[in-house]
Amino acid sequence: MTIHSDFRSAAELVSAAHTVSVVGHLRPDADAIGSVTATVEALRQLGKDARGYIGQTDPMPSNLNSIPGSEEIIFTSVLPVSDLIIVVDCGSQERTGEFQESIIGARDRTIVVDHHATNPGFGRVNLISTEAESTTTILLDWFDVLGVQTTRTIAHGLYAGLLTDTGCFRWGRPVMHDMARRLMEHGLDIREISAELIDKTSLEDLQLVGRIMSRIEMHRAGPYRLAVLVADHATINGHSKAAVEGLIEMVRAVDGADFGAVFKEYEPGVFTVSLRSSHLSVGSLAVHLGGGGHVPAAGYTARGTELEALDTLIAAAVELGESLTTTHMANG
């Protein structure tokens, strides 16, 4: 069965539903929020009672508030009962956060839309394309099947996911530019969107980034050179998560590094680890360590001290060795 036939199966589930919950992933990014807002708007256009949800009570990074419709997304630990659940941009059930048990119990009325290679397909219908640059690009094609008219709000959400998940169009298939063109035709101010999602920062955030970046180190991990940055709990507690999450893009660009890693200690002794590389399959490395993601961009959770977490990553890179270079790096 192709994803196009799955589009039709998913459309049938949408047609039969009245109330629909659209769920994005824990610690959402622009692809998650853009996917939720665009899907909610599309469903309402089809006459559905649709709402967007994130399975956490912590707020999202403030720059994501620039995506139209984001103000309506509900951050909560309880997912209301609905006729249909559409899970977007979640590579696993765990990524739905507090909603995990509810999602497990509602498989027969769940549609999964995602582009992560590690997604096992946990819905009744799974619209998964690992070639897709972002979840929003899959939604663009599905909305065509549903007969949804692309509004400026829908276009904004879809473009936000495409822009950020391609690193501002630095990787992806040629078709991504055609998708961007389609979305731009709906009157998007792409300069403003980029400014809000990529460029805008505060003096406090820049000062925080400076303190953390001064600690960057280079380590040997078998045949590879690893740029490492640790954002410890004492330094980042109470500060902007958006600033901390953006650190990996600077670390990945260090000259001479094969891949970059940022260890973010949001809770004492628990590190959210982001991995990036332009030529290695850090997705395989993350899966080996219990996480997931894409070939060039992935992550996992580590526990223990800073030294223990780093030693575990280095040992995994040494164990996997040259296999990390075997995956095709055409897109993210």
Per-segment meaning from a language model:
Residues 113-181:
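Short alpha-helices
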Residues 101-108:
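Short, conserved loop/helix-junction motifs that constitute active-site signature segments
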Residues 2-26, 34-62, 81-82, 159, ...:
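Hydrophobic helix-and-loop "lid/oligomerization" segment in the mid-to-C-terminal part
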Residues 3-5, 66-73, 93-94:
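Short gly/ser/thr-rich secondary-structure transition/capping motifs
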Residues 82-83, 123:
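Local beta-strand N-terminus motif with an aromatic residue
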Residues 71-81:
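Short acidic low-complexity segments
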Residues 32-33, 95-99, 122, 272:
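Short glycine-/acidic-enriched loop or helix-start segments at secondary-structure transitions
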